[in-house]
Amino acid sequence: MEVLDATGLAERLRWEDNDYLLHLKAETSFDKYPAKQHARRVQAELGVEDGLIYLPGQPARNNEDSDMPAPFRQRRYFYYMSGCDEPDCHLMYDIRRDVLTLFIPRIKPERVIWNGRGSTPAEALAKYDIDQVHHSQDLAYIIQNWAFKHQNTGIYILHPSSRIPGCDNLMPRIDSHSLQPAMNLCRMIKDDHEIKRIRKANDISSQAHREVLANIQKYKNEAQVEGLFMDVCISRQAKQQAYDPIAASGPNAGTLHYDANNEDLAGRQLMCLDAGCEFELYASDITRTFPLSASWPSKEAENIYNLVQRMQETCIERLEPGVRYLDLHIMAHQVAIDGLLRLGILCNGTREEIYKAGTSRAFFPHGLGHHIGLEVHDVGQAELMSVRRGKPVYQQAPSLYPENFHDPVYDSETCHAPTDPQSSHLEEGMVVTVEPGIYFSVYALQHFYLPSPIHSKFINLEVLERYLPVGGVRIEDDILITANGHENLTTAPKGEAMLDMIRQGKPGTTDVLIPSPTYSRRMRSENNTPRLCAPGISKNTLRPLLTPLARAATLPTEFRQQDDFDFEPTVGPSLFSGFSRAMTTEEKIQQWKQKRDSVPVALNRPTKAKSLSPVCGENTPNVQHVYMSTASDLASFSQLSAGSGSTPLWKPHNKQDKKN
């Protein structure tokens, strides 16, 4: 296609008196996936000026012991640098020459008859953002020829187990450790093309959630909910789900990744629907929890929903570049503890005491969220969340909380990225989920938390039993971090808007998708809303919505509402001794003490706890039962053993244990 000299054309037409109609026809798409741009970003992260990157695509294969083809799912690292969603392909990038080469299989007649043909070299060159196309059978020859001409340069592959077909002699020159971290750093920051696809996936999934809300009163089984959601997505050309849908009703919602989706809805209070589609390989991840009728079935269900919604809104409000995500995870636990204390589920302690014991994990056991992109749990683990080059401004912003303050509520096995102790700060272009939840897992409560003296003293059994039928509540949105704050890409309704849709039975316009709302902190800065200057948080951070209990001394001074006593007394123990208390005066201390004494916090005290059979089944009086999982449990156990006259005994749980 010839290049149009627009400048020269405009100069010539300037002297003409007639009007001209210019018709342009493009032979290729203007909206190609930016594979070449991604390749250059990876090279910049590798920090090398010469070398070769090799990535294999996913081969076509059959199901095990079957002649039926397995569902094809392209390898995400390969796709990130190629934009090619065809099987049996390979990719090579010559770093010094800046040449991106795609290798595709030859077209075979039997493949065309049964499965249709793939792209020809000319079609692939027009379709993908690449420089050259060759057939796969030429891969070994081309790489060997390149290696012969570049004797002292490295070849980069993704994994130590990866190999280049026909190039085993090149193994001493292969670097299998540098490429994946470099690609992960690139994949965490989404470009405009990627954001467009994630937004589209969110729009389709949000419409599917609306359809479910509008029809939920008609349905009798979880399978119908799953079926409708997938039907809406497929009809909008989003044929792949980012993960297996979770349509959990009643107690099933207490299982985080429940996927049976086959139980009747009769007698259940709530449905937790966690489902999101893929659009052109990019994922969405949305959760809505809603009643199965036109109103809240119980006050307990409404209370838990409102608490989870408050947890989510409090955390989303603070998302912007420079914020440490783990701080928001901690904050979500503190909001949860406040709410559970008010409801009487937690008791006999302050927020600080309950937090330090880790008891809130009985009800909020997972991380606040994760990256989302080509994978629903996208790249961004601990070693990849370090402060990036070129972002020195964040290096001077420490965590909002003291070192290791996350220990009681963080578990590396269950809290996925970016909720990680080594996480640094959110950056513009990241897309993360915010998905707090409150769950009532009967198994976890009976087998760990209630038998443990560390946790059981804070749990009111009588009140807890009233909340067990709720099952669980989770609310999840996908959030884009922008230069000025954040944008919520998820448009599925929540709260009153959600209830109205259930009552009306109308999902809204199905052909025109509702645009995503945009939130900008710079726009909000024009009003007189007071702002914070807490360590680790930008000066543009808005004042939170928290209203902590009067006696709780768990949040920094800056996180108290202004119409409350905006200070923390200097007397007594505090986890925040490093924080300044500029507003603390003797007069305010006296006011705080008077208010504390005149309006004491009413905490529900449990009646005599029901006797529980220990997990091991041993009820002998001289056997001391202690249940441990964290470092704090072990420390408490050591103190308990040292101060008691009895000797802790381990008892086998079954005959097999006795043999061992």
UniProtKB/Swiss-Prot annotation:
Stored CDD domains: Prolidase
Cofactor binding annotation: Binds 2 manganese ions per subunit.
Transmembrane segment boundaries: none
Record-listed Mn(2+) 1 binding positions: D285, E435, E476
Recorded GO MF terms: manganese ion binding; metalloaminopeptidase activity
Region (Disordered): 641-660
Documented EC number(s): 3.4.11.9
Binding-site residues for Mn(2+) 2, renumbered to this chain: D274, D285, E476
Keywords (A to Z) from UniProt: Aminopeptidase, Hydrolase, Manganese, Metal-binding, Metalloprotease, Protease
Cofactor: Mn(2+)
GO biological process, one term: proteolysis
InterPro entries in the cross-refs: Aminopep_P_N, Creatin/AminoP/Spt16_N, Creatinase/aminopeptidase-like, Pept_M24, Peptidase_M24B_aminopep-P_CS, X-Pro_dipept-like
Catalyzed reaction equations: Release of any N-terminal amino acid, including proline, that is linked to proline, even from a dipeptide or tripeptide
Record Pfam families: AMP_N, Peptidase_M24
Enzyme class: hydrolase
Function: Catalyzes the removal of a penultimate prolyl residue from the N-termini of peptides.
Family, similarity comment: Belongs to the peptidase M24B family.
UniProt xrefs under PANTHER family: XAA-PRO AMINOPEPTIDASE 3, XAA-PRO AMINOPEPTIDASE AN0832-RELATED
Name of protein: Probable Xaa-Pro aminopeptidase PTRG_10574
Organism: Pyrenophora tritici-repentis (strain Pt-1C-BFP)
Taxonomic path: Eukaryota, Fungi, Dikarya, Ascomycota, Pezizomycotina
